[in-house]
Amino acid sequence: MDTTYEVKIWKIGSRKQAKGTTYTVRWVLGGREWRTPFATRALADAFRSELVSATRRGEAFSVLTGRPLSHTSGASSVSWYEFALRFTDAQWHRTSGNSRKTTSKVLMTATSALLRTSVPSTLDPVALRTALREFAFNTRRRAEAPPEVAAALKWVERNCHSMAVWEDSSRVEEVLQAVSSRLDGSETAASTIKRNRRVLNVMLEYAVKENVLRTNPLPKGRGTAPKTSIAVDKRSLINARQAAALLGWVRRRPRGGLRLHAFFATMYYAGPRPEEVVAMYVMDVRLPSAKAADQWGELLIHTAQPEVGKHWTNDGAIHEERGLKGRARDDMRTVPCRPALTRVLREHIEREGLKPGDLLFPGEKGEMLAGSVIRRAWRSARQETLTPEEFASPLGKRVYDLRNTCLTNWLNDGVPPAQVAEWAGNSVPVLLAVYARCIVGHLSDLKKRIEAGGDLPEI
């Protein structure tokens, strides 16, 4: 393509006509004058600003079209907001509910950073962000937006930059800063930053695929993303005394305490993820006869039901049925059920009068057990049984820490990592990366093994 860097941009000219005033942007390219008329000064200003920005970036102009080369990619003819909606719809049916929520939050933040003007006083910034997150970037709900939300989104549509803004490195940095920060300006967690940047990267790769951008403008290479660690914080692990106190308090809880005690005991003794436990049915529990000498049983883990919210699932349910994490859709795993857990589950099933086709841990009305109920009970148990210092610490802060404690106990009890990985639904490398720091009690034996190799002979 023939290009030139000889560009001169004139001021905007206006001309009154019978049908209204026309605002024209004029610029000279290699001795040839180009003109583009607009119906409003704002549109003319926006277009002229793009031309000026291109010259400041040192961008070449096409002598055939008169436009910067970035315009030939289609970036200037597509608004950011329009493209973000298109990307949302393209991703909706290929992603999970939680991924949809994350994508919506990232696009909301990016859109706020890519507005051409400040939010007017007539619009509430909080309501505007809610409109973007809950309606604009939600394929199912967009058409259901109430009038006030639709009006706010119309304002966003009119006041967003074009996709050409992604060809300005300073604006790209502004967006990256926005998705790396909380509303108060403080930096968010490294894992959140990494996840948000991953969404942006997928979106920009899609823009390249759709010929909206020529290249992905996100910086590449070492140091561009924060370092993250997947290792378990040893301070979050629960010892046997603390676990007994926590589960004992839950068992004595008047409302649903016995059911929740069995739920937490399953996590502590068998290590499934919370979303796997809520998805279990009575038929997934294989218990020996009460009179059998061997009281070991088995748990069949084959489904997960993460709680994502009714607005983000295909059928409007709060939970979304999925296969096991990192496994094929129809895969499953078998986990041993130690005698202590066998006793708890047998009593639970008999007390609740559960049938094989019933959920193992149903809610009060037979529905799937709500995450809010689980988290509220666990928080109350921590508050009532731990010291103020322990309660303020990471000790058992999340329900998930029961799983981490179980897997750590298995490793410390000498169960081979490959077997623990199979029971936990992890790969061995991931298991060791997450839990290796928590393996203790083997140092004395390891020292003896090293010494058994012998020292160098005296010469």
Predicted regions located by residue number:
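DNA major-groove recognition helix of helix-turn-helix
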Residues: 48, 197, 281, 424, ...
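Basic, Lys/Arg- and aromatic-enriched nucleic-acid-binding interface segment
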Residues: 184-199, 213-280, 292-296, 320, ...
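C-terminal flanking helix
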Residues: 201-204, 208, 428, 439, ...
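Conserved tyrosine-mediated DNA breakage-rejoining catalytic core shared by Y-recombinases
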Residues: 12-15, 123-133, 220-227, 242, ...
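Short, basic (Lys/Arg/His-rich) helix/loop patches that form interaction surfaces
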Residues: 250-260, 270, 335, 343, ...
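DNA/chromatin major-groove-contacting recognition/catalytic segments
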Residues: 433-459
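Short, Lys/Arg-enriched alpha-helical recognition elements, typified by the DNA-recognition helix
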Residues: 26, 68-206, 220-222, 379
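Short, surface-exposed polybasic/aromatic micro-patch for ligand or macromolecular engagement
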Residues: 6-73, 328
